[in-house]
Structures are given as structure tokens and as C-alpha cells.
A protein has these predicted regions:
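Short, basic/aromatic recognition patches that contact phosphate-bearing ligands
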Residues: 1-129
Length: 129
């Protein structure tokens, strides 16, 4: 049910993280095909993933069609996926909703995003119920 509400880029990052954690290397084009997105989308997601998880990356190599990522010893996959899901605006706003913080201006100030984006995400959260 949540998969209908959480942002697609978050799901892609989690999937890429899981694949790289398990296999340490992925084929960029095959991954793009299996996720039904373009190769530049996968490359952008990989770049974003490496940027936000740089504190736990031991080695990162990009070749023409392959991408290799080795995580530091002692890093748990659950820690990585929890961090990635924590970047979801939907989940953040859901948390704010349960904590009684749901005015548009408060949310815009807390997340440093536009009111337009806040209205869009608030609608998604309210549709969830």
C-alpha cells in the first residue's frame, strides 16, 4: 500500500542500494530496463545514492556499462534502507501529521521547500487516509 505513495526515486534508490549491497556491481543498462526507466535516470539515482551515502562507501567505480559500489565493513543494509526511506517527503509529512504539525507554512519552513510542493505532498498524505 505504501508503494503507491512513496516517491518513485526513493524506491529506485533503495532497490539500487540493495542490489549493490548484495552483488557490489550492477549493469547500468540492464537495471534501467528492469526498472523501466532510462539509463540517465539510473545514473542520476546512482550519483545521488553515492552522494547521500558517502559516509559508508569504501569504493566506488563507474565504467561504461557497469557500476561498482563497495560499502564499508560493519554497515547493515537495514541502516542504509532506513536512511534512504527517511528522505521521502511522504513519510516525513506523515510523521509530521501524526505529531500534529501539518500547517503548510510550518512544513515549508521545516523542509525548506516551496508551498506548492507542500500542498502537493499534503494532498498525497490526506489521500492516504
Amino acid at each position: 500500500m505504501l508503494e503507491n505513495y512513496i516517491e518513485r526515486n526513493i524506491f529506485r534508490k533503495v532497490y539500487l542500494c540493495e542490489q549493490l549491497f548484495e552483488f557490489q556491481e550492477i549493469d547500468i543498462e540492464q537495471t534501467a530496463i528492469s526498472l523501466r526507466v532510462t539509463t540517465p535516470t539510473i545514473l542520476h539515482d546512482l550519483e545521488s545514492l553515492a552522494e547521500c551515502l558517502e559516509y559508508c562507501i569504501k569504493e566506488q567505480v563507474r565504467e561504461k556499462h557497469k557500476y561498482k559500489l563497495v560499502f564499508k565493513h560493519g554497515i547493515a543494509l537495514s541502516e542504509l534502507t532506513q536512511f534512504l526511506y527517511g528522505q521521502s517527503y511522504f513519510l516525513k509529512f506523515l510523521s509530521y501529521y501524526f505529531n500534529g504539525i501539518f500547517t503548510s507554512t510550518e512544513l515549508a519552513d521545516l523542509e525548506f521547500i516551496s508551498l506548492s510542493k507542500v500542498y502537493t505532498i499534503k494532498k498525497i498524505v490526506l489521500d492516504f487516509f
